[in-house]
Every structure is written in structure tokens, then in C-alpha cells.
Regions:
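FNR-like FAD-binding dehydrogenase module
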Residues: 1-508
């Protein structure tokens, strides 16, 4: 395609989120000269998702392209309701038509959809609740046995959950056209659109629903576009088209995103269309279950041949009758002793100092304490721990209900291996958080940072805590105890961040 240089227009779109850096792409041949750029800033955490910016961006893009490169006479652009054919060919046969040996092999594969070079099977040796039975939050310390895993403090364990038996049963009730005993084969139509590696071998439909399709996902707009295309019942088709339209995005948000309505629950609301979904469209409508990352809470030397994770079981209510359940955390809570699960290790974001004489300040409320349990226990096991070098600031609601690993911390403190500072937000009338304890220890913290080159690590929920902790270091530690002006205090913390002496690992 040729274009005069003075005709060239270019659009640029930046993808990002509230907690991440913005990245952007520009596609341009070297001979092109950019004369104008329309920049659209996109936030994936917007209430309406990427569609809040994608819609006007696409409208602008196609208008510019059509003005520069008009379609041939008689050709018309495809409208938004056009749905492309499925990416792959999906076929199935019943188990009665398969060779017995092949059927046995397919059904005997425990986890056919997880393909990782460093994947290992770990056995559950303890699934312990660390919070009291009366506490609203169920938190689990999951201990797994394995001699094949190598990791360092700060690394994360990747876990891929399964759908609940209840949801799997509901899936086949809502979509009776699919036989749980059938064997499915996925083949490519074009080499440009290869079949994902986990789907390249035949697999059991039941295992696919149990282990691959994310039944708990919140469906996005494209799901409703496809469903509207497949719908035959006019009443359902109209509603699906409304949810798929630009004008219906606020209604879609109120129907799906705000109450956290799952894909399976949406299928239940459109029973006629659900019962007619063709097999070819199964992998267009459903997304794969994603592996979850958990900070490793164990120590290679302190817990040999084991790996531990600390998991808050997600359960909350919206306007919907059924409570909202986190897929992975609730699956973990059901794991029984000796259950073997596939896991693998990824490098974490925390980089702890190798010099054991450098003081380390750790702030980890709630399950944010997990990576620090790994690091502190490792230092203790190697005989390198000391109260003058390890400082843990822990926060929770009640001293007797959700003080995770309480006896371990108190024992380390008694042995002079750890300086422990705790904040219990509900044990007294006035709420008390880790940032309040940081303020109280401002002189100590400034001395550690300014004179002893201490490192700071912050882990936990990303909602308010990380920003408030950072503000406390700027205003009370550097500004108060260090007597630095606000600008200098801010630059001091920024320099720590640049040098890797202030590290944060948070999650939503």
C-alpha cells in the first residue's frame, strides 16, 4: 500500500492501569514521516474496561483510514455486529468410538492443560487455618511436600486452580449439547492462528470444563457480541445486542461488573442461547483459567523439601443472592491431605540484600507477611538473624484472631533474632495501623536508613496501605525524625527506590 508522505496520519494508543506504567505502540515504516498523532490514554481498571477508550479510538482510526484509503466501489465496511468465524476447528467423539487404550491414556492424564518446563507435583501435608473460627476471614497456610523444587526468599509459587464440582455440574446442565464423556480435538485452520499448546492433544470434555475453562470469569463485551450472534430467541437476542452495543455499556457494567456476575451465571440468564452454543465457539466464549501467584512463605533451609503459601480465602457479597467466591483461594481451602497439585516457581520482585549485616525493614500487614516469613526463617536457619538487623512491622485486626504465624514471630523475638512491631486495628476503640507504628518508631527508622543503609520492603493489599506507608516515611521518618524539607524527604525516598533500597510488592 502506497501513501504520500503528506497524507500520513498516525494514531497512538497507550495501555495502562491505575497501578502500572503506561506503554504505547507505534507502527511506522522507516520511510514514513509522522505528521500528527492522536493519543488515547487507556485505563484497564476503568469501570467499563478498555472499551471506555477503545470505542472512540477505533471510530477515529477507521474514519482516518477510510479517508486515506477508500474502499473499492461497492464495498462497505463491516459493522460492529459482524462476528468472525471460530479460530479453530473443534470436533468431538464419544468414548464408545475410541480405542480403549487411547481412552485410558486421555482419562488418566491428571493435568493435561498445564504445560511448563519447571512444573512439579507437590503433595499437601497440611492445610491449616491461621485465623480463629470466629473470625470473618478464612486464611490458610498451605504446606506442600516436594523434593524437586528450588526457590529463594522473595520468589512466588504459581498455582492453577480447578473449577468447583458444583460449577462443573451446572455447566453441563446449562449446556446439555456437550457430553462430559466425549473426547475433544482442536485443530488449526490457519498457521497464522496456531492452536494453544495445552489444546493440541485430544482431551476429555469433562477435564476441559474442570481444569481449563474459567467458569468464574466476569464476561467482557465480546462475550455478549458472540452470544447475540448465536441467539435465536428474539427476547434474549435483543438483550444480548443491547449489552454488546456502545450505548449499553453502562447497563452491562451494572449487570455484570458491579455485582461480579460470573460467566456461568450469565449463561443461566440466557438459557435458550446457552443450550445452542456450538462446540466451535466454546473456546471463543470461554477464557482459560489463569495461574495465580502467591508469595512463598517458607524457607529453603528452614523448611527443607517443603514449600508454603499463605492464602486469604476470598468470599464476599454483592446484590446477588449467592456469595462471590475467589476461584483459586476457595479451591485451595478444599485441598485434602496427600492431594497432589501441579505448581511451579517464578522469580519474585523482591531482591533481598546478600550482605547479612545490612538492616532490613519489612512492612507486611495481613497475608503480606508471607515473603517475610520466608526471608526471616531463612536467616534464622542459617544463623544469620539478629534483632538489630531484622525489623518486622505486622498489622491485622485482632491479636487473638488473625495474627498469622503468631507463635513463630514471638519465638524469634524472644530469641533475639527479630525486632517485632505489631498493630491491631480492632483491639481498641481507636483504629491502629502499621503506619501509626512507623510514626512511633520514626527515630529508629531514620537512624537505620540514614546511618546503616537499611532496606525497606512493603508487601500487602494495594488499596491504601502502600501509599500511606510511603507517605509516612516521607513525612514522619525523613521529614520528622530526619528534619528534611518535604521536597528533600521525597527525593530521599525516590533515591531509595531507584537504588533498590525501597521495594514494594502489592496485589489487589
Amino acid at each position: 500500500m502506497e501513501a504520500r508522505r503528506d497524507q500520513l496520519k498516525m494514531l497512538q494508543k497507550g495501555y495502562g492501569g491505575k497501578h502500572g506504567d503506561i506503554t504505547s505502540w507505534v507502527l511506522c515504516e522507516q520511510w514514513m514521516i509522522i505528521l500528527s498523532v492522536s493519543l488515547y490514554m487507556n485505563d484497564d481498571q476503568h469501570d467499563l474496561g478498555v472499551d471506555a477508550v477503545v470505542d472512540p479510538w477505533l471510530k477515529d482510526l477507521w474514519a482516518k483510514l477510510l479517508s486515506l484509503f477508500p474502499l473499492p466501489q461497492g464495498a462497505e465496511p463491516l459493522d460492529r455486529s459482524h462476528v468472525y468465524a471460530p479460530r479453530w476447528t473443534v470436533t468431538c467423539v464419544t468414548s464408545q468410538h475410541l480405542h480403549k487404550g487411547l481412552m485410558t491414556m486421555i482419562q488418566g492424564t491428571e493435568d493435561p492443560f498445564i504445560i511448563k518446563e519447571n512444573l512439579i507435583k507437590a503433595s499437601v501435608i497440611e492445610n491449616h487455618r491461621t485465623t480463629s473460627e470466629s473470625h470473618f476471614q478464612d486464611v490458610r497456610l498451605l504446606r506442600l511436600s516436594t523434593s524437586m523444587l528450588t526457590y529463594n526468599p522473595g520468589d512466588v509459587l504459581m498455582v492453577t486452580p480447578h473449577n468447583s464440582a458444583e460449577n462443573v455440574k451446572k455447566f453441563f446442565e446449562l449446556l446439555p449439547q456437550f457430553d462430559p464423556d466425549s473426547i475433544v480435538s482442536v485443530t488449526e485452520k490457519s498457521p497464522d492462528v496456531p492452536v494453544p499448546i495445552p489444546l493440541r492433544k485430544p482431551f476429555s470434555m469433562k477435564k476441559c470444563v474442570e481444569q481449563f475453562l474459567d467458569l468464574s470469569a466476569i464476561p467482557r463485551r465480546y462475550f455478549f457480541e458472540l452470544m447475540a450472534f448465536l441467539a435465536e430467541l428474539e427476547l434474549e437476542k435483543e438483550k444480548l445486542e443491547e449489552f454488546a452495543s456502545s450505548e449499553g455499556q453502562e447497563d452491562l457494567f451494572n449487570y455484570c461488573n458491579r455485582p461480579r456476575r460470573t460467566l456461568l451465571e450469565v449463561l443461566q440468564d440466557f438459557p435458550n442461547t446457552s443450550s445452542k452454543i456450538p462446540l466451535d465457539y466454546l473456546f471463543e466464549l470461554f477464557t482459560p483459567i489463569k495461574a495465580r501467584a502467591f508469595s512463598i512463605a517458607s524457607s529453603p533451609h528452614g523448611h527443607p523439601n517443603e514449600v508454603h503459601i499463605l492464602v486469604a480465602v476470598v468470599k464476599y457479597r454483592t446484590k446477588l443472592l449467592a456469595p462471590r467466591l475467589g476461584l483459586c483461594s476457595n479451591w485451595i481451602a478444599t485441598l485434602n491431605l496427600n492431594r497432589r497439585i501441579p505448581v511451579w516457581v517464578k522469580k519474585g520482585s523482591f531482591q533481598f540484600p546478600s550482605d547479612t549485616s545490612i538492616p532490613v525493614i519489612m512492612i507486611g500487614p495481613g497475608t503480606g507477611v508471607a515473603p517475610f516469613r520466608s526471608f526471616i526463617t531463612e536467616r534464622v536457619a542459617l544463623g544469620e538473624a539478629g534483632a538489630e538487623r531484622l525489623y518486622l512491622f505486622f498489622g491485622c485486626r485482632y491479636s487473638r484472631q488473625d495474627f498469622h504465624c503468631r507463635e513463630e514471630w514471638l519465638n524469634f523475638e524472644r530469641n533475639g533474632q527479630l525486632s517485632l512491631f505489631v498493630a491491631f486495628s480492632r483491639d481498641q476503640e481507636e483504629k491502629r495501623y502499621v503506619q501509626h507504628v512507623l510514626c512511633e518508631q520514626a527515630d529508629l527508622l531514620w537512624d537505620l536508613l540514614n546511618k546503616k543503609s537499611a532496606y525497606i520492603y512493603v508487601a500487602g493489599n494495594s488499596k491504601n496501605m502502600p501509599d500511606q506507608v510511603r507517605d509516612t516515611f516521607i513525612s514522619h521518618v525523613c521529614g520528622g525524625a530526619g528534619e528534611l524539607p518535604e521536597t528533600s524527604a521525597t527525593k530521599f525516598i525516590e533515591q531509595l527506590e531507584l537504588n533498590g533500597r525501597y521495594q514494594t510488592e502489592t496485589w489487589s
